[in-house]
Amino acid sequence: MKQFLDFLPLVVFFAFYKLYDIYAATSALIVATAIVLIYSWVRYRKIEKMALITFVLVAVFGGLTLFFHNDEFIKWKVTVIYALFAGALLISQWVMKKPLIQRMLGKELALPQQVWSKLNLAWALFFIVCGLANIYIAFWLPQNIWVNFKVFGLTALTLIFTLLSGVYIYRHLPQEDKS
């Protein structure tokens, strides 16, 4: 259910874009993201940091898009989020000396430090590449292509990279954890 909620604002954004325009889609995205955040609080009495950061960025960049009637702001939001994710991963590894991926999954998985570091760097690189791809597609290709890329392309890339990460993790699990 939680994973569905995470994708709900994206589905709403896409539907409103197809039915109306980028500005209606942006308004719907802000409202849907707020509703998901409120629902998460009511249902689980908890709001994840990533969800809160995403909402703030959606509200700020979406608000700027609507106020200035300029879709460039909402297009930048994707890259800014990915840059923040990549930055957090890199800072966790080089400054805090414990990769963020390990902080998130380390209680459930026993992996060598080198595996955590490689996985953390791989995700940071993934977010950097996705952010750069977003810039290219958002500002050099037609808007409808960007919307499709944002909704389907980035979602598919993230799912594929998550599966590949799972395979990488599985290969490095201790034998007793593989069963």
From Swiss-Prot:
Q: How does it sit in the membrane?
A: Multi-pass membrane protein
Cellular component, GO annotation = plasma membrane
- Give the protein name, as stated in the record: Inner membrane-spanning protein YciB
Q: Does the keyword Transmembrane helix apply?
A: yes
Which InterPro entries does the annotation name?
YciB (IPR006008)
Q: Main site of residence? A: membrane
Q: Where in the cell is it found?
A: Cell inner membrane
List the lineage, top down.
Answer: Bacteria, Pseudomonadati, Pseudomonadota, Gammaproteobacteria, Enterobacterales
Q: Does the keyword Transmembrane helix apply?
A: yes
| Chain's role | Plays a role in cell envelope biogenesis, maintenance of cell envelope integrity and membrane homeostasis.
Keywords, sorted A to Z = Cell inner membrane, Cell membrane, Membrane, Transmembrane, Transmembrane helix
Q: Which HAMAP family match?
A: YciB
Regarding protein family, the annotation reads: Belongs to the YciB family.
Matches recorded under Pfam families: IspA
Q: Where are the transmembrane segments?
A: 22-42, 50-70, 76-96, 121-141, 149-169
